[in-house]
């Protein structure tokens, strides 16, 4: 049990170093760009799917 506490403590120290070091700001900027990129791609593929959809197959 003490080993798990030590592992999580080390992970917390590493996360704090990244968070307080300014890396989080850069990662948030990249995440915003990726969000809008994938949102635009979703809308494009949605429109393509609605336009290109054919009727039901013949029986």
Swiss-Prot record:
Chain segments annotated as transmembrane: 5-25, 30-50
InterPro entries given in the database record: DUF1328
Annotated keywords: Cell membrane, Membrane, Transmembrane, Transmembrane helix
Lineage: Bacteria, Pseudomonadati, Pseudomonadota, Gammaproteobacteria, Legionellales
Chain coiled-coil ranges: none
Protein topology in the membrane: Multi-pass membrane protein
Domain of life: Bacteria
Localisation per UniProt entry: Cell membrane
Annotated GO CC locations: plasma membrane
Family: Belongs to the UPF0391 family.
Name of the protein this chain belongs to: UPF0391 membrane protein lpl2443
Pfam families: DUF1328
Keyword Membrane: yes
